[in-house]
Amino acid sequence: MVASANGVVAWRRRDAHDDPVLAILGGDRRHPARIADKRLLRLLRCFGDVAVGAGTLREQPELVLSPQQPSDEPAPELFAFRERAGLPRQPRNIVYSFSGELPLQHRIFTTAGIEPLVVTTQRGADELARRARPGASPATVAEDLREPGGLHRAQQRLLAEHGVRYLDCEGGQTLLEALHGARLLDEVFLTRTPFVIDETAHEDVGRIFDFAAAGATLIAEGGTVADESWRFERWRFSQR
C-alpha cells in the first residue's frame, strides 16, 4: 500500500485523469524512491499469490498481478525465486468482489499464463457467469462474504481447493479493512510518501489504518539514500 504523508490512500475519482495513487506517489516515475517502491511491489509478488479488490481492478485497467508486468524491465531472478520455491511461474490473480460486476475484458482475465480467481458471493458468481456467456466464467469461490465467518470460509477454501497458502493483498483499503475485521490480516507493507494531500479537494477520502489503535506493531522501517523523506514500513497485526 502507498499512503501520503497525512495518511490518505484513495478518494473518489472525478474522471479518468484523477488518479489518487499517482498523486500520492508524486507523479515522477523516475524518482529513485518511486523505483524502490516498484521493486518492493514486484518482490512481494514472488512469495505466493496476489489479490486486489474490485475497485482497484476497475481503476487500473492495465494491472496484471505479476512480478513482471508487460511494461516492466526484465527480472528473471524473480521468476527463478518462484521456481526454487516450487511455485508456478505466475501468481494466481485473485479478485474480491461482492457483486461479481467485473470487467471480464480486463488484463487479469485475458493475459496468457495468468490464472484468475474471483472470491465473491453466490449472487456474484451468477453475475460473472452471465457476463461471461457464451464463454466460461472465471473460477470462483462463492461464500456469503457479508456474514461473520464468510471471509474465513473463503480463505479456507482458497487453500483447500486452490492451494493458496500465502496471499499478497495489494488493497485497496476497503479490502484490507475487511480482512483485518475478519482477523485474517497478518502484515501490511506501507510506502509512506512525503506528499500531503488536500483532503478538502476530494470526496470519499480513504485513509490508511491508525496502526497503533488497530494493535499493529512496527517491526521494520527504512528509506532510500536518494530521498529519505520516503519511508518504507512493515506493520505486523498477527504473530501467526
Language-model regions, residue ranges each:
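Enzymes that bind and transform nitrogen-containing heteroaromatic metabolites
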Residues: 1-240
